[in-house]
Regions:
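Sec/Tat signal peptide C-region and signal peptidase I cleavage site
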Residues: 19-24
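Gly/Pro-enriched, hydrophobic low-complexity segments
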Residues: 172-293
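Bacterial N-terminal signal peptides
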Residues: 8-17
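Acidic/charged, solvent-exposed loop-and-adjacent secondary-structure segments enriched in E/D, K/R, S/T
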Residues: 106-150
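Bacterial N-terminal signal peptides that target proteins for export
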Residues: 1-9
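N-terminal mature ectodomain segment of secretory-pathway/periplasmic proteins
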Residues: 31, 38-118, 164-172, 185
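Soluble non-cytosolic domains of exported or imported proteins
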Residues: 26-30
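Short, conserved active-site entrance elements at the starts or edges of catalytic domains
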Residues: 141-182, 203
Length: 294
């Protein structure tokens, strides 16, 4: 499972081998980005892309297990993004559906359980309280994820999250060479985009962030007896920042735009998840409530 990670983890040498001497940053970065945009369709076609909907299979590492499911990524520029996961974490008919994303200044987060057997309850962590520091941090994280996906897929920074691009040098591994673009944005947003020198398409995007977590509690039977409370476990310690690498491949043309149909992530060098898209739609007609808080 996750066999393709062997290819991508091998290419992590790009980030470890050091970079060649840097050129005049902004000008070189602009030239490379223009070259990359031409490689995936050109400015005329890319400027017309205001939305994407990508749906397919999800594989995720969960402890020492691998779980499978479905994933949908909906993106509407300049400020809307929704990721929907549908998985069976217990390996049975119980299906956990989670939604997370952003609509302007509103965090989108929802979860529900379908087909849970009688006497079983699957509990997901509740969303942060409105106006809390946790909600503000989640809002920043969601904006950052929208920006990363927008750049990785369309080489476009969303207007809601303006980014600065500078040349980061050339990286090399036994797999080949890549041009490196450093990205900086609002707050502490920092990332690196690696462009394959052979075809100029996005190959990898690296950043530091909080590892995605899924905490699921199960309860069978009648639950706590009369007079007892269903106790919530104490809050976990603040998560630490980790190195996250996003790999992109299996490019195919969709309405004249070359888009990756396979995306994988590694966290601190270990396989985390991969998306294998069966359908990718450009400028889909989203339902009115797609990005509505639930």
């Amino acid at each position: 499972m996750m066999q393709r990670f062997s290819i991508y983890l091998f290419s992590l040498a790009l980030t470890l081998g050091g970079y060649a001497a840097r050129a005049a940053g902004d000008t070189k970065a602009a030239e490379l980005l223009a070259q990359a945009r031409t490689a995936i369709g050109g400015d005329t076609k890319l400027s017309k892309v205001q939305g994407l909907s990508c749906a397919g299979a999800l594989q995720r590492a969960m402890g020492d297990r691998q779980i499978a499911g479905d994933v949908t990524i909906d993106l509407q520029l300049p400020d809307k993004f929704l990721r929907t996961d549908s998985i069976s974490p217990m390996g049975d008919a119980a299906l956990v559906v989670t939604e997370q994303g952003i609509n302007g200044d509103k965090v989108l987060r929802n979860s529900k359980t379908l087909n849970a057997p009688p006497g079983m309850m699957i509990r997901m962590p509740p969303p942060p309280a409105p106006g809390s520091d946790a909600e503000m941090q989640l809002l920043r994280n969601s904006r950052a994820e929208l920006a990363r996906l927008s750049v990785a897929l369309l080489l476009t920074a969303p207007a809601a999250t303006p980014l600065e691009f500078t040349y980061g040098g050339e990286a090399e591994s036994p797999d080949g060479k890549a041009d490196v673009i450093d990205m900086k944005g609002p707050g502490s947003f920092v990332a690196k985009l690696f462009l394959d020198k052979s075809n100029h398409r996005p190959l990898m995007l690296t950043y530091r962030g909080v590892a995605p977590r899924m905490v699921i509690q199960t309860q069978r039977g009648d639950g706590p007896g009369r007079g007892q409370d269903a106790r919530t476990p104490p809050p976990a310690a603040a998560p630490e920042q980790v190195d996250i690498n996003m790999f992109l491949d299996d490019y195919r043309s969709v309405d004249g735009v070359m888009l990756p149909h396979h995306i994988a992530r590694a966290i601190d060098g270990q396989p985390s998840e991969e998306w294998t898209f069966k359908t990718v739609k450009v400028n889909p007609a989203f339902k009115a409530d797609t990005f509505a808080p639930k």
